[in-house]
């Protein structure tokens, strides 16, 4: 809280004729218009008795009830509605949180166990003698009844393939046995056996003959990598076999190898038949699961995730959030700063309401309707009890917002500092300690991010921040910004420096903090449900076959690898271990037909290829297994077009007559499965099942589209530029062929009213102007043209008419906007692509102005109104009337830069100035301020700019942010000259702050007259002698200005109170993603300045 300044009481006499509308009583009070202070009137002009005066309550709760009854926030009302769910739970009774007990008569010889496995990991199970191996894969899961399971799958040996030596004695079993003995002497008895098998390599077509391979089984899974290295580097010396090194095959992790061979996919159901599994004895159990069993891998039954086995078990999902009490000016550090509250919300997958809502608090806390409060005298006790709560509740999924990089590591480090030794054991394995591992995740699709990984065995972790960063491109990823974007609501955002004040207050202020903390725990659960994060990732794990945990920790390639291994297993095919390395090889991308730029006030029909790249791969049989060369063609006497084709870029692939490729088979299955899922989705009525089916069809679509990218990844598991470049080459020829076919058929010469013109084409679509002004006619022609062009290409390539644009503004390649129509009666939306209005690296003002301009031009057809709005915006920028929140630019912080970047320089400055700053992967908000320094040195934190009265660089925002995007929109309509003319500004005066040195050191600063701005003489008041005669008039105007600002500040204050849901307490919110916050700070600053000016009268 800022220090209050006491101003003297002053009585002022005002003539009736000067202020007929005002009362004659004016008094001056002390004021504190800090961000966290209530809008107490400084100049109280009392027009009537109905004027309300607010009294500041500070941080301590008062007995005075200003509003009659305490108002609850919307969130508290939600909690109140849930209250009946907790009627049967006694306060402080953890037993009510436990899972349903197992039947007392449970007998493994009488009951099958079917469970949905949610996590898998390799481990060692002592005391199990199953085919001389103690290595197991542990599957954690949940039954349909909600019982937790740990299933140890035993007996599976890891293996790799090598080509059998090209030697006469390579098939001699005695020689093979000697080689096994040699390997065991070399690798400490790590080899179990060698089996001779017939396989084909996935790489290249050389005929249909299978070749001999050795399948080498190892005793310990980790020995595969050592053995693989020895084979590939030629370190083995036996009968001259492999002395020059050889390629090894099927390089895949042990856990995934078992899942592939057993037909288990991620998040699928497994059945353990009665009599085939054994219960782990109580004294040998290592987990807290209700059922802990072991089974040989040959005896388990894996169910495909379809039909009756597509449902989801009643998974327990726990969302939590913590609050820490930091020191002044320092971001909380676990070595010094306590955890003061932990809020928890627990729900069942598919349920509408959470069945547990509680807060663990340090010190007392007033009750919260619909929630349980567990108060503790010491932090050690709170942390220990929270850990016990986790064990009792036994969540299957732990979610939150930034829990991976902050909450969980902070709790572990804090418990370590306090020596709470039992705390880091809240996973499902009793003796496995939770530990932090720091890493850097980097991929082309997701960028580079610093992350911390904590092993919580048996419990899935789904950090909604990481999920949203992967799946959505937003300007800001704060919980506030994300909630506003997806849920349409804001939340109070209390700065960490204020949290200590609330904690050190009383039980009421701690209650306010608890409600805040509880909402931060509840929002991730709502976001997960809204975005179907758990459902979509479950279906992605099922479709691609990988464990759920891979989806957040790994990139895209492992998903395709898993599908390839599964299909190869079916058809006796092995995959070579390719040495992944960067390559400079490039291939030509998709064709973009040169756009005919302009504004089209006639319908533009858009023809789209349905799943273009997957369709090309299927139609032309493009695959690793079908790739061949000229020598193979000659050796096998293959006939062109019948046995093989030459792609547009010169690569050879055999046709389906010779062999159907694995990739086309996978794609065909994915697309067919998606059609089935979409059909089931249309027929399904149950909302949760609909969500599951929708998640499945999305996962199938994404998986099909990622296969092409997998082949083109030069740094990857199995790159093949012959495939990826052939796909894009076919795509280019198809786009050009479509253009030619449409323009040749739909022309006046063939009896049509107009000559059709393809105005633009990009990757998988072409935009056609048929010439008609009638929208329905254009849509009918588009449908007809799509059917006609589809006949020119091989199945399953299909061109569809999906939409028309009318009107249509074509600016450049990959940049256009238009009204989007799927039926002629009503447009669907205003669609944009590639414009600054949908980009994240420009300020929101650009998006606001462009959207408004496009709306006026395309929807209202009011070009003059659009131009007037642009001129008005330019004027507002020049006169500093644009709210600073609209000028914020946001960019992601990368680890390294060749040249200084504004946001990176600011991040370092913030760390030096405030002790804490953005991390790699975070988005940094900044504005550009005035001055003559280099641009990267003029990036500044928006709040710092407001608080220190620093002026932004108007010219930068006009020329570097707004000018080019707006000109690109209006120039096609009004011409380049007039469009550029709107941004011609002769001069802009920018206040860059005080200057020192040079001539400035001889200049003395003096006060200026509040009316004429002339210099004041010593001893003169706010007005110079020339303006003194107008003192009364000017004073009344100043009073009006102050009153207007007070009224505005009160409205903003009330708006913030309503958002926080508490109209009787201080506004503590510092949400930097909220326009109201910046407006409140700015008005507060202006009000303080006006009050100080008025005090000089």
UniProtKB/Swiss-Prot annotation:
One of its GO terms (molecular function) is 3'-5'-DNA exonuclease activity. One of its GO terms (biological process) is double-strand break repair via nonhomologous end joining. GO terms for cellular component: cytosol; delta DNA polymerase complex; replication fork. Transmembrane segments: none annotated. Keywords: 4Fe-4S, DNA replication, DNA-binding, DNA-directed DNA polymerase, Exonuclease, Hydrolase, Iron, Iron-sulfur, Metal-binding, Nuclease, Nucleotidyltransferase, Nucleus, Phosphoprotein, Transferase, Zinc, Zinc-finger. Catalytic component of DNA polymerase delta (DNA polymerase III) which participates in chromosomal DNA replication. Required during synthesis of the lagging DNA strands at the replication fork, binds at/or near replication origins and moves along DNA with the replication fork. Participates in leading strand synthesis during replication initiation and termination. Has 3'-5' proofreading exonuclease activity that corrects errors arising during DNA replication. This is DNA polymerase delta catalytic subunit. The lineage of its organism: Eukaryota, Fungi, Dikarya, Ascomycota, Saccharomycotina. The gene is POL3.
């Amino acid at each position: 809280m800022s220090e209050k300044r006491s101003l003297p009481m002053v009585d002022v006499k005002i003539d009736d004729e000067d202020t007929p509308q005002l009362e004659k009583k004016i008094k001056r009070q002390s004021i504190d218009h800090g961000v966290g202070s209530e809008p107490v009137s400084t100049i109280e002009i009392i027009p009537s008795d109905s004027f309300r005066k607010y009294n500041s309550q500070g941080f301590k709760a008062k007995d005075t009830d200003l509003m009659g009854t305490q108002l609850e926030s919307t969130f508290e009302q939600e909690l109140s509605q849930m209250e009946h769910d907790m009627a049967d739970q006694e306060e402080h009774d953890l037993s009510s949180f436990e899972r349903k007990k197992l039947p007392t008569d449970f007998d493994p010889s009488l009951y099958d166990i079917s469970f949905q496995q949610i996590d898998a990991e390799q481990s060692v199970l002592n005391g199990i003698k199953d085919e001389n191996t103690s290595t197991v894969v542990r599957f954690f899961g949940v039954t349909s009844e909600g019982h937790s399971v740990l299933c140890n799958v035993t007996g599976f040996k890891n293996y790799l393939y090598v080509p059998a030596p090209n030697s006469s004695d390579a098939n001699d079993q005695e020689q093979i046995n000697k080689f096994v003995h040699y390997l065991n002497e070399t690798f400490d008895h790590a080899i179990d056996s060698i089996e001779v098998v017939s396989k084909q390599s996935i790489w290249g077509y050389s005929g249909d003959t299978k070749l001999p391979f050795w399948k080498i089984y190892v005793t310990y899974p980790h020995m595969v990598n050592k053995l693989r290295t020895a084979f590939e580097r030629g370190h083995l010396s036996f009968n001259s076999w492999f002395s020059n090194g050889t390629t090894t095959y099927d390089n895949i992790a042990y856990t995934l190898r078992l899942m592939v061979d057993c037909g288990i996919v991620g998040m699928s159901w497994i059945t353990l038949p009665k009599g085939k599994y054994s219960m782990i004895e109580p004294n040998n159990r290592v987990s807290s699961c209700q059922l802990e069993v072991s089974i040989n891998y040959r005896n388990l039954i894996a169910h495909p995730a379809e039909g009756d086995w597509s449902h989801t078990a009643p998974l327990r999902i726990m969302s939590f959030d913590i609050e820490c009490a930091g020191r002044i000016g320092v971001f909380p550090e676990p070595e010094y700063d306590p955890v003061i509250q932990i809020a928890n919300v627990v729900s069942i997958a598919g349920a509408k309401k959470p069945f547990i809502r509680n807060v663990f608090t340090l010190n007392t806390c007033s009750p919260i309707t619909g929630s349980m409060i567990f108060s503790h005298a010491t932090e050690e006790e709170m942390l220990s009890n929270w850990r016990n709560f986790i064990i009792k509740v036994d969540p299957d999924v732990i979610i939150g917002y930034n829990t991976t990089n902050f909450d969980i590591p902070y709790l572990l480090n804090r418990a370590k500092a306090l020596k709470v030794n039992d705390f880091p054991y809240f996973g499902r394995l009793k003796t496995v300690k939770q530990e932090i591992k720091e890493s850097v995740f980097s991929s082309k699709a997701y960028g580079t991010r610093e992350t911390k990984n904590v092993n919580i065995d048996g419990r899935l972790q789904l950090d909604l921040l990481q999920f949203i960063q992967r799946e959505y491109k937003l300007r800001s990823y704060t919980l506030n910004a994300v909630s506003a974007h997806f849920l349409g609501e804001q939340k109070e955002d209390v700065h960490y420096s204020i949290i200590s004040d609330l904690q050190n207050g009383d039980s009421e202020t701690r209650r306010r903090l608890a409600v805040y903390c509880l909402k931060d725990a509840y929002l991730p659960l709502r976001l997960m449900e809204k975005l179907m994060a758990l459902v979509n990732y479950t279906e992605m794990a099922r479709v691609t076959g990988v464990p759920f945990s891979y989806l957040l920790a790994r990139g895209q390639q492992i998903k395709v690898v898993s599908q390839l291994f599964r299909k190869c297993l079916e058809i006796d095919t092995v995959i070579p271990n390719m040495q992944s390395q960067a390559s400079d090889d490039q291939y030509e991308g998709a064709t973009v037909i040169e756009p005919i730029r302009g504004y089209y006030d006639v319908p533009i029909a858009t023809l789209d290829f349905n799943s273009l790249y997957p369709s090309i791969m299927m139609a032309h049989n493009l695959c690793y297994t079908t790739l061949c060369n000229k020598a193979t063609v000659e050796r096998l006497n293959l006939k062109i077009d019948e046995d093989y084709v030459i792609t547009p870029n010169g690569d050879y692939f055999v046709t389906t007559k010779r062999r159907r490729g694995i990739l086309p088979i996978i794609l065909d299955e994915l697309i067919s499965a998606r059609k089935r899922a979409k059909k089931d989705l249309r027929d399904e009525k149950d909302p949760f099942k609909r969500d599951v089916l929708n998640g499945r069809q999305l996962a199938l679509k994404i998986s099909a589209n990622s296969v092409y990218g997998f082949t083109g990844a030069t740094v990857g598991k199995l790159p093949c530029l012959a495939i990826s470049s052939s796909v894009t080459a076919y795509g280019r020829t198809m786009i050009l062929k479509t253009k030619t076919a449409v323009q040749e058929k739909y022309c006046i010469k063939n009896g049509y009213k107009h000559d059709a013109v393809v105005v633009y084409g990009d990757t998988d679509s072409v935009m056609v102007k048929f010439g008609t002004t009638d929208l329905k006619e254009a849509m009918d022609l588009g449908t007809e043209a799509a059917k006609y062009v589809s006949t020119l290409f091989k199945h399953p390539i299909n061109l569809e008419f999906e939409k028309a644009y009318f009107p249509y503004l074509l600016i450049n390649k990959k940049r256009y906007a238009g009204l989007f129509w799927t039926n002629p009666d009503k447009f669907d939306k205003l669609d944009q692509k590639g414009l600054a209005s949908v980009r994240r690296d420009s300020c929101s003002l650009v998006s606001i102005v462009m959207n408004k301009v496009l709306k006026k031009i395309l929807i209202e057809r009011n070009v003059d109104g659009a131009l007037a709005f642009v001129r008005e915006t330019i004027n507002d920028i020049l006169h500093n009337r644009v709210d600073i929140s609209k000028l914020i630019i946001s960019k992601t912080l990368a680890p390294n830069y060749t040249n200084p970047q504004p946001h990176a320089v600011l991040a370092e400055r913030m760390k030096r100035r405030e002790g804490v700053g953005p991390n790699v992967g975070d988005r940094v908000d900044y504005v550009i301020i005035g001055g003559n320094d280099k641009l990267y040195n003029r990036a500044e934190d928006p709040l710092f700019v407001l608080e220190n009265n620093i002026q932004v660089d108007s010219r930068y925002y006009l020329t570097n942010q707004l000018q080019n995007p707006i000109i690109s929109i209006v120039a096609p309509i009004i011409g380049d000259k007039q469009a550029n003319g709107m941004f011609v500004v002769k001069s802009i005066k920018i206040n860059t702050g005080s200057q020192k040195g040079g001539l400035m050191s001889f200049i003395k600063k003096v006060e200026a007259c509040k009316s004429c701005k002339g210099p004041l003489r010593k001893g003169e008041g706010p007005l110079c002698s020339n303006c003194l005669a107008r003192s009364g008039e000017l004073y009344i105007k100043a009073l009006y200005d102050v009153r207007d600002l007070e009224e505005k500040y009160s409205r903003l204050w009330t708006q913030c109170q309503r958002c926080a849901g508490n109209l009787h307490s201080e506004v503590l919110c510092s949400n930097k993603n909220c326009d109201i916050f910046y407006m409140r700070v700015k008005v507060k600053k202006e009000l303080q300045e006006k009050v100080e000016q008025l005090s000089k009268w």
